[in-house]
Amino acid sequence: MVTGTDERLERFRAEFLPKLVTAFRPTVVMAFGSRIRGEGLAHSDLDLVIVSDSFRNIRWLDRPGCVIEALGLKFGVDLFCYTPEEYARKREEFGVVRTACQEGVPLITEPST
């Protein structure tokens, strides 16, 4: 189990979040899942919800790969990438986004400027 401050989350914040902001200008980035609950193992991935207008013209299934490639991520992540409209709908449904909103740690919660 990962204890204390999660190294993967802190590495993402320091190294990759600035790149994400530059490349995709997200309005919401939320970390959630086993690492955030303190239940993650050393090999557990980092679960992230990312909301950006930049995803509008990218197929839903292609979005995570685009983010991983643009940021040069070298460790396990599970990315859920939505447009603002998709995110607004998903927040009201039972599922990943609702869970992330309930238990997640916001990394970005307002529009990027």
Predicted feature locations:
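Catalytic core of pol beta-like nucleotidyltransferases
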Residues: 1-28, 36-43, 52-113
